[in-house]
């Protein structure tokens, strides 16, 4: 069963939150962070992407960069741009899609998801109560571990899902009917972000006790952050001769959402060539395993599982997997990412390793089908393949079976904003 606790968050004053908050470190590169921070000295990018304070081209792994993060984190607190709450509490973080002309997702405009910001147990990560569905890379783990170690804090939360729970739904609905502590629309994604404080002892007790009845939590997004936080916590426990188990380093910050509320977008593929085939030869080869239907020049989106959308030569096609070619009892093999990788990318195009092959690139669904069309029409890519989104049920089934999702399979949106709450490991 899941162990969570309240904590004394470090966060910006209400009037500074829009200057401090940022996108998460791993969705943009150094130059994008430099551009977004601009001349805003209060931007969290100075802590989570501190290479922006050095000349262009400075490696994010330079030891001076880690030192700068520590210096800036301390300075933000000294200047009052970040302040620690006086008492332990939980937080409720709401994200609403399509609150502005700047943002919005097809079919999801106005949808809100409500997450509980908690301190999750390192022990739960180690013993499998917190379930994973992705492999992590050691180099990325090491980078995040350094940030956690040197700052002695979880600067950014991890994104968890949990099976829907009526008690938590009711508590969240009641508290979010009041005025939030933060309420703003992010300039980049155009989504609305709100935060409430959960201070009442009864409510805190209800959250803690209800999570203790939930058998598993699922990492939706942030596998490297989860691994780094848990490994640093375990390190600190080992190094402390008086370790008790209730120290703050035994926990790491997560935002937990009911599984049914989450939005998973398509994660699409663009490929540079047809492996020596002409357009006609490629379409003929596809017809062996798919019913191929020409749809025309207007962008066409797959309508169901096992249907794919192909853009080739200025034309969109529907590719429907023929009956009997998917084993629905196989949680991995029946995924559309697995089917497309095996029957199209590997067998026809000769792309064996999605992580390393330079002939393929990936486009998150937030960019829309227009981005696929653009990259083919400008000659950069030869074809694009759009997939139907993976469901949260599929992800949970794979995690429950102890399996790992294929690479580039999930794209959760909205992303959590960073800088709304920070968790210190020594309190």
Q: Where do the PLM segments sit?
A:
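Surface-exposed, charge/polar-rich loops and edge strands
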Residues: 1-427
């Amino acid at each position: 069963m899941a162990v969570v606790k309240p904590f004394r968050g470090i966060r910006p004053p209400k009037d500074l939150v829009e200057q401090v908050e940022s996108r998460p470190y791993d969705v943009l590169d150094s130059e994008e962070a430099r551009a977004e921070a601009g001349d805003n000295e209060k931007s969290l990018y100075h802590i989570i992407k501190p290479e922006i304070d050095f000349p262009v081209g400075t490696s994010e792994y330079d030891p001076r960069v880690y030192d700068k993060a520590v210096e800036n984190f301390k300075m933000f607190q000294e200047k009052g741009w970040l302040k620690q709450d006086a008492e332990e509490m939980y937080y409720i973080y709401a994200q609403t899609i399509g609150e502005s002309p700047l943002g919005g997702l097809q079919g999801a405009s106005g949808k809100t998801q409500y997450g509980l910001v908690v301190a999750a147990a390192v022990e739960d990560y180690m013993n499998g109560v917190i379930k994973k569905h992705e492999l992590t890379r050691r180099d990325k783990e090491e980078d995040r571990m350094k940030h956690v170690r040197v700052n002695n804090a979880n600067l950014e939360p991890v994104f968890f899902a949990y099976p829907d729970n009526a008690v938590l739904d009711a508590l969240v609905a009641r508290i979010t009917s009041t005025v939030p502590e933060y309420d703003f629309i992010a300039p980049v994604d155009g989504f609305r972000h709100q935060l409430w404080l959960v201070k009442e002892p009864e409510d805190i007790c209800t959250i803690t006790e209800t999570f203790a009845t939930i058998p598993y939590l699922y990492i939706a997004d942030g596998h490297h952050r989860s691994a780094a936080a848990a490994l640093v916590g375990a390190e600190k426990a080992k190094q402390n001769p008086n370790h008790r188990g209730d120290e703050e380093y035994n926990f790491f910050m997560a935002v937990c959402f009911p599984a049914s509320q989450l939005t998973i977008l398509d994660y699409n593929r663009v490929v540079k060539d047809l492996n020596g085939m002409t357009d006609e030869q490629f379409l003929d080869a596809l017809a062996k395993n798919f019913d191929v239907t020409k749809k025309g020049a207007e962008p066409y989106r797959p309508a169901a599982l096992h249907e794919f959308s192909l853009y080739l030569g200025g034309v969109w096609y529907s590719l429907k997997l023929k009956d009997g070619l998917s084993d629905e009892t196989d949680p991995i093999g029946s995924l559309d990412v697995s089917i497309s990788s095996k029957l199209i990318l590997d067998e026809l195009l000769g792309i064996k390793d999605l992580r390393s092959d330079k002939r393929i690139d990936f486009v998150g669904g937030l960019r829309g089908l227009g981005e696929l069309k653009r990259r083919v029409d400008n000659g950069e890519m030869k074809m694009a393949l759009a997939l139907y989104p993976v469901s949260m049920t599929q992800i949970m089934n794979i995690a429950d079976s102890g399996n790992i999702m294929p690479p580039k399979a999930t794209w959760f949106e909205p992303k959590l904003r960073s800088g709304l709450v920070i968790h210190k490991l020594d309190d």
